[in-house]
Amino acid sequence: MFDKTKKIYVSDVTLRDGMHAIRHQYSLEQAVRIARALDVAGVDSIEVAHGDGLQGSSFNYGFGAHTDLEWIAAVADVLKHAKVATLLLPGIGTIHDLKQAYEAGARIVRVATHCTEADISKQHIEYARHLGMDTVGFLMMSHMTTPRHLAEQAMRMESYGAQCVYVVDSGGALNMYDVADRFKAFRDVLKPETQTGMHAHHNLSLGVANSIVALEHGCDRIDASLTGMGAGAGNAPLEVFIATADRMGLNHGCDVKTLIDAAEDIVRPLQERPVRVDRETLALGYAGVYSSFLRHTEVAAQRYGLSAFDILIELGKRRMVGGQEDMIVDVALDLLQRRDARGAGAH
């Protein structure tokens, strides 16, 4: 059942996950305009970073138009209500990067690991608490392990000092029952004061539904983005989620019309590739592939004359996870070899 008096913590990810949709190319002016609208609308936090987190700007993930610190400082400078959040993936970002992000204005950090690798977050979570940051554990690709094992990983993050732990559906592969099971498992083992969060992707068109089910099972924080701006088919669209929550009489604290206008007038025109469910983004959810593989896969498909759908399905079969972007080309070359072998056999 829903507690309609409980305030939903609304966490916007347009300026972090949304980076993937435009290959990390937001200008400072665009970032500030989006942040201002979100702040006026009443969201609680605005995550700002390269799509792959602090120091994600690289050959492997793609170079950003600006540094993380430039984006963070620009956004922090204009906010009156919302707090600046950022993302850190241990192994990409370091505690030194986190300290600089804090100095630039970030006050919340989500420390993200693969769903079975919470142990690598210890140093970063402890340091974030030392800085006095609101510290969140972020268990990516949560569909790839059982609810019980995911809850055990959440307990580890909690033991390191995480004040909130997220179910992160990076592949957009979870359905409502999967989400319910994971939040039930979290509540069974986490301390009552430890908050929980839901980060949905819309690859099976379930981003909003999964977020609502998470709330039904005690979730405290919901990630969403304007127009769903994010990797793959995007995240739960913020304006749709808030409109739904509003119709249900839930306490969200946001202005629906301001979000709808910002989505349509500011964010949608920036999309060079529509953020939607289509053949390729559906393949992500269907095969359970990391959503940010989408743009890299489409480049490889074009280069080698292959179907992006076929590459994504094969990546899913091989259970590739975030950080293995280099395997996209390997898979493409294997598919090319198979195709050539079939062609040779036909003669």
UniProtKB/Swiss-Prot annotation:
Keyword terms of this UniProt record: Aromatic hydrocarbons catabolism, Lyase, Manganese, Metal-binding
InterPro entries: 2-IPM_HCS-like, 4OH_2_O-val_aldolase, Aldolase_TIM, DmpG_comm, DRE_TIM_HOA, PYR_CT
This protein's name: 4-hydroxy-2-oxovalerate aldolase 1
Annotated GO biological process: catabolic process; L-leucine biosynthetic process
The EC number(s) this enzyme carries: 4.1.3.39
Active site residues according to the UniProt entry: H20
Residues binding substrate, per UniProt: R16, D17, S170, H199, Y290
Reaction(s) this enzyme catalyzes, per UniProt: (S)-4-hydroxy-2-oxopentanoate = acetaldehyde + pyruvate
PROSITE patterns, per database record: PYR_CT
Top-level taxonomic group: Bacteria
Residues the record lists as binding Mn(2+): D17, H199, H201
PANTHER family: 2-ISOPROPYLMALATE SYNTHASE 1, CHLOROPLASTIC-RELATED, HOMOCITRATE SYNTHASE-RELATED
GO MF annotation: an example: 4-hydroxy-2-oxovalerate aldolase activity
Family: Belongs to the 4-hydroxy-2-oxovalerate aldolase family.
Site (Transition state stabilizer): R16
Keyword presence, DNA-binding: no
Domain Pyruvate carboxyltransferase: 8-260
